[in-house]
Structures are given as structure tokens and as C-alpha cells.
From Swiss-Prot:
NCBIfam families: cinA_nterm (TIGR00200), PncC_domain (TIGR00199), PRK00549.1 (NF001813). This is Putative competence-damage inducible protein. It comes from Pelotomaculum thermopropionicum (strain DSM 13744 / JCM 10971 / SI). Belongs to the CinA family. The gene is cinA. CDD domains: cinA.
Length: 414
């Protein structure tokens, strides 16, 4: 089954809000073995919406339209779909009663715009909205399936999972099923990953896809088969070939995060951590504390941006700052060691660098970063030169720092 997604709303078209529906629906449909062939975003314009819908019907088996179901004059989805399909709009009394009840609870008078939400193309199955006032619709006509969903994400997900998912799963069950696995890597570039896997690519089914983020590469294995067991077997067999080639760079799979993996290792080893940050501005500490229960292993952190703070709070000696500068191997080590002493933690990370866009010199260019890890009995420090704009350099640095810690914890005996 081939699917096409049409996202309506001028706010999406202009980039005023993020289109999270594309990711959510894409993952839901691909997980059922439904192939998504095209995304279209169209503004609140009747003629353009009609053209997009008409073209989608000609190309695809399943058309999902999101947004445009509200009470205002620019909410045109139901009217547009009915017009293209040559169907009249008819009142659904049950939907109208539900809308009236919501308005009464809120102490509001029912408007004509609100009533509009209770009209649907003739023959449509009405999908109740448990989190809002605008119902959706499911239409089967001439061998095509048209699914109409609300725009707000929390309304869309509830309606899709409660009403549309069971129907689509049954339809998709008659065709191919898709399964996938995602490896998450750090400390390696996308081109290096592709080089290591070049003889495994190009199979078509299963297939390998790559996605790069600052400091992280994702390798996605995807397979289609007539049943879930066979599809999973195809994924697992390819994963078994990939893992040995990338073992040292893989930090997790699926929804795992680097900070979550590091947290688990710290708990397993019964070790505590603190961080001293300069160029990352607290990003490492923020990510570590995103993990529930991180207080079990994370003692705290300091953002020492100025030389004065490095000296007064972390105890970085003035002669190190004078002789080597704030961005240096020596300063990074002194930051990590000073933080570990102050926090009383088993381990500490010290980070200093030049995130840019200014501040770089010929000897110390933009993107130069030093990352130190202090532990009982010593410290290590690594030098990096990251490329990209300021935000990317900071993200690369945070990921690399946590990966240095991860690799240390993996080699440290219990």
C-alpha cells in the first residue's frame, strides 16, 4: 500500500511551527509496512488544497490529510475533500451534540463556525476527537482510503492511535510488514561509516540508511516481508554483520541516548560525576540531568566562562592561564581536577574551547576544544578541532565529552 501525506496550514508552510506530524505518521505507517511515497505541505488556500488532494488520489492508495478542521474561515479541509470527491457535506448529530457539550462546559455560546466542525462528506466514518472539538473522518471511495486528522499534535496522535491505527493495521496486514533497527554512533563521521559498510549497501531489501546529527550518526536497517517474523529475521541478520564493524562507535540502539547510556554505566560502577564547562555553557550538565534519577550519580557542575571564574571557583592556577591560556590542555586538566576536588566526585569532566564565530586565532582557531577527564590517580586530555557554526561545535563537544566518559567506564573494572 502506498501512502501520501498532505499537511495543511499556512503556519506550517511558512515555518512558524514545526511539522512533527511527518515524523510521527511516517514511523507509524512504515512500521505497518505502508510505504510513504510523498509529503506535501499546502497553505490554507482552497484551490491549492484541491489540486494537491486531486493529484494525491491519482498516485496513492492511502491519503492522510492533517489540519484545517477547526471553526475558522481558513479551516477548509472537509469542504475541499467533499468537493473533490463530489460528495455533499452532511451533519452528524452525534458530533454536534458533543461539540455543544464542550461549549456549554466552557460557558461559551455555540457559533456557526463551531457547528461547521460537525459536517462531513457523505458516507464518511466520523472519528471522535477525545482531546478537542474537531472530529476527523475516514472515507473509502473507489479503492482509495482518505484519512482526515486534526492539526494539533496531541489531538492527532490520540485520534490516530484510537481510531485509525486498528483499521490501517488490518488493511496493511494483507500486504508487506516492515521492521527496522537503529544503531546510534559517535566518534566517527558519516563517510567513514559508509566506507565500512559499503559492501552491505545497495541490497534494496533490507536496506541501510544514514542520518547525521552534530556528534552522532544513526544507521537504520529496514526490511519488508510478508510477515513480521521474516522481516525481523532479515533485520537481525544484517544487524549481526554491521555490529562487529562499528562496535567501538556504537553507544546505543533505538531510543537510547548517550547521556542515558552514561548514566546507566555510572550507576552500575557506583561512581559519581561532576562537570566543569566553559565553551559548552552548561550543555553537558543539562543533558546529564535530563535523565530521571541522575541525582544518584551526578554531583553538579560549574560554568566557568571567564578566566576569573576558572581561577576563583575551580582553582585553575594563574600561571597556567598566563602561560598556556584559557583554551589549552593544561587549563582543561586543571578545570577537571579542581571540579573533582570541589564536588568530591569520583570523576570529573573539564571542557574549554573556542565555539566561535569570533575569538579564533591562527594558533588557536575557531572550533579548537580540549576535553579532560579527571579520576582518582590521574587525568587524560584530548584535543579536537570541530567544524561548523557555534551551536554545532558545542553539540559536538558535549557528545565527545560524554563518549570519552563512556569509553572510560566500559574499560574500568568494577
Amino acid at each position: 500500500m502506498k501512502a501520501e501525506l498532505i499537511f495543511t496550514g499556512t503556519e506550517l508552510l511558512l515555518g512558524h511551527i514545526l511539522n512533527s506530524h511527518a515524523q510521527y505518521l511516517g514511523m507509524q505507517l512504515s512500521g505497518m509496512g505502508i510505504e510513504v511515497v510523498l509529503h506535501t505541505t499546502v497553505g490554507d488556500d482552497r484551490e491549492r488544497m484541491s489540486r494537491a488532494f486531486r493529484e494525491a488520489i491519482e498516485r496513492s492508495d492511502l491519503i492522510i490529510i492533517t489540519g484545517g478542521l477547526g471553526p475558522t474561515t481558513d479551516d477548509l479541509t472537509m469542504e475541499t475533500v467533499a468537493s473533490v470527491l463530489g460528495l455533499p457535506l452532511v451533519l452528524d448529530e452525534r458530533s454536534l451534540a458533543a461539540i455543544e457539550e464542550v461549549y456549554q462546559r466552557r460557558g461559551l455560546a455555540l457559533t456557526e463556525g463551531a457547528k461547521k466542525q460537525a459536517y462531513f462528506p457523505e458516507g464518511a466514518a466520523v472519528l471522535p476527537n477525545t482531546r478537542g472539538t474537531a472530529p476527523g473522518a475516514l472515507i473509502e471511495k473507489d479503492g482509495k482510503i482518505i484519512l482526515i486528522l486534526p492539526g494539533p499534535p496531541h489531538e492527532l496522535t490520540a485520534m490516530f492511535e484510537n481510531s485509525a491505527l486498528p483499521f490501517l493495521s488490518e488493511k496493511a496486514g494483507k500486504g508487506a510488514v516492515m521492521r527496522y533497527k537503529v544503531f546510534k554512533l559517535t566518534g566517527i563521521t558519516e563517510s567513514m561509516v559508509q566506507e565500512k559498510l559499503k559492501d552491505l549497501g545497495g541490497q534494496g531489501n533490507p536496506e541501510i540508511a544514514y542520518m547525521a546529527k552534530p556528534g552522532e550518526i544513526q544507521v537504520r536497517i529496514q526490511a519488508r516481508a510478508g510477515n513480521s517474523e521474516l522481516a525481523q529475521k532479515m533485520v537481525d541478520e544484517l544487524a549481526d554483520k554491521i555490529r562487529p564493524r562499528l562496535e567501538e562507535y556504537i553507544f546505543g540502539c533505538g531510543e537510547e541516548t548517550l547521556e542515558g547510556v552514561v548514566g546507566k554505566l555510572l550507576l552500575e560502577k557506583r561512581l559519581s560525576l561532576s562537570v566543569a564547562e566553559s565553551c559548552t555553557g552548561g550543555l553537558i550538565a543539562a543533558r546529564l540531568t535530563d535523565i530521571p534519577g541522575s541525582s544518584e550519580y551526578f554531583k553538579g557542575g560549574v560554568v566557568a566562562y571567564s578566566n576569573e571564574m576558572k581561577k576563583e571557583i575551580l582553582g585553575v592556577p594563574q600561571d597556567i592561564l598566563d602561560q598556556h591560556g584559557a583554551v589549552s590542555r593544561e587549563t582543561a586538566v586543571a578545570m577537571a581536577e579542581g571540579m573533582r576536588r570541589m564536588a568530591g566526585s569520583d570523576l570529573s569532566i573539564g571542557v574549554t574551547g573556542i565555539a566561535g564565530p569570533g575569538g579564533g586565532t591562527e594558533k588557536k582557531p575557531r572550533g579548537l576544544v580540549y576535553i579532560s577527564l579527571s579520576y582518582a590517580g590521574g587525568a587524560v586530555c584530548h584535543e579536537y578541532l570541530f567544524s561548523g557554526e557555534r551551536r554545532s561545535v558545542r553539540q559536538f563537544t558535549a557528545n565527545t565529552a560524554m563518549n570519552i566518559l563512556r569509553r572510560y567506564l566500559l574499560t574500568k573494572p568494577d
